[in-house]
């Protein structure tokens, strides 16, 4: 090749290399964004659930009931089958069962994130479909296993539970959930920023903040979705102490894998792998009946003290 042509070819190649790199990067960015954009589009195009214009009277405050409820996220895969049980007002009801049985789905139907395919979900004695969103949400406080905190202060993240609360009330609720210990550790105390998503706090500490929100809201019904399953003993103790406080004033419904934490529940609802309620009763009653709950309990007892043993 003629040296002049070779130099010209190299010069042109170098000129367009950056352009081609930018095109490749842009293509990758478009492909990466395709799935999130599709998810946002799905959310925006979701059908809005109908609701009444005005609140209705609640004949049974603090009570939750399922009456012949069946539900599936799609028609081909039903999750719940003909579920019926009542959560009495003012007590602690625990829901137990294997993973994938539909326990968290029960909570989502209580909060009306979806409507049941058949049957009726009642909160406060009234079908959730006959309540305004504001009325329904005012009765519920929810504590989930995965907690998201905003890039704001400890105080403001707790105040979300009750926007009109004073700083004093926020700190009282925080103290009951053990958040005061977190405030003492952080530079800035109660005014310290927790970072986006609460990244400056551990998972257990974020859970305490979430419980403090629920304490501050003082809702008639509290839903705990496996809130202590991944906590260390110290954080778990703080959360359980806060639940004891809430138990004095609220109806508590808790999903639990740790059966020893719900022995004192007023009622235990057992859900099997098919999404059906197979047992309802107290711990002692269910142990005596030798059913699914007893199997789970005895499996837990066999696992106590289990440890990995290294090779000699």
Where are these regions (language model features)?
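ABC-family ATPase nucleotide-binding domain "signature/switch" substructure
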Residues: 105, 138-146, 157, 173-179, ...
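Helix-to-loop junction immediately C-terminal to a conserved catalytic motif
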Residues: 111
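Conserved post-Walker A/P-loop segment of ABC ATPase nucleotide-binding domains
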Residues: 114-122, 164-165, 264-265, 280
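Cytosolic ends of transmembrane helices, especially the final helix of ABC transmembrane type-1 domains
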Residues: 15-43
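ABC ATPase nucleotide-binding domain
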Residues: 83, 133, 137-140, 151-152, ...
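Conserved ABC transporter NBD signature motif
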Residues: 119-126, 136
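Primarily ABC-family ATPase nucleotide-binding module
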Residues: 44-93, 115, 127-129, 168, ...
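The feature captures the beta-strand-to-loop junction immediately N-terminal to the Walker
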Residues: 96-98
């Amino acid at each position: 090749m003629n040296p002049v042509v070779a130099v010209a070819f190299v010069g042109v190649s170098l000129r367009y290399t950056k352009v081609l790199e930018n095109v490749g990067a842009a293509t990758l960015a478009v492909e990466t964004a395709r799935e999130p954009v599709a998810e946002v589009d799905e959310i925006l195009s979701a059908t809005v659930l109908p609701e009444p214009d005005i609140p209705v009277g609640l004949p049974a405050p603090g009570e939750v009931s399922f009456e012949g409820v069946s539900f599936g996220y799609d028609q081909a895969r039903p999750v719940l089958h003909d579920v019926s049980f009542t959560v009495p007002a003012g007590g602690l009801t625990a829901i137990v069962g294997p993973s994938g049985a539909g326990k968290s789905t029960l909570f989502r139907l209580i909060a009306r994130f979806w409507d049941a395919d058949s049957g009726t979900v009642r909160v406060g004695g009234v079908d959730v479909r006959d309540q305004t969103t504001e009325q329904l949400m005012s009765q519920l406080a929810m504590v989930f296993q995965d907690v998201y905190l905003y890039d704001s202060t400890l105080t403001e993240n707790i105040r979300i539970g009750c926007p009109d609360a004073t700083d004093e009330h926020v700190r009282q609720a925080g103290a009951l959930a053990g958040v005061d210990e977190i405030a003492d550790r952080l530079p800035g105390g109660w005014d310290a920023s927790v970072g986006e998503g609460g990244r400056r706090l551990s998972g257990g500490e974020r859970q305490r903040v979430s419980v403090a929100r629920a304490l501050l809201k003082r809702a008639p019904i509290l839903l705990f979705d496996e809130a202590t399953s991944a906590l260390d003993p110290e954080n778990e103790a703080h959360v359980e102490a806060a639940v004891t406080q809430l138990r004095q004033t609220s109806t508590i419904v808790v999903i639990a894998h740790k059966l020893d934490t719900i022995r004192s529940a007023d009622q235990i609802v057992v859900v099997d792998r098919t999404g059906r309620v197979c047992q309802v009763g107290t711990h002692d009653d269910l142990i005596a009946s030798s059913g699914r709950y007893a199997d789970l309990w005895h499996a837990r007892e066999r696992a106590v003290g289990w440890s990995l043993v290294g090779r000699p």
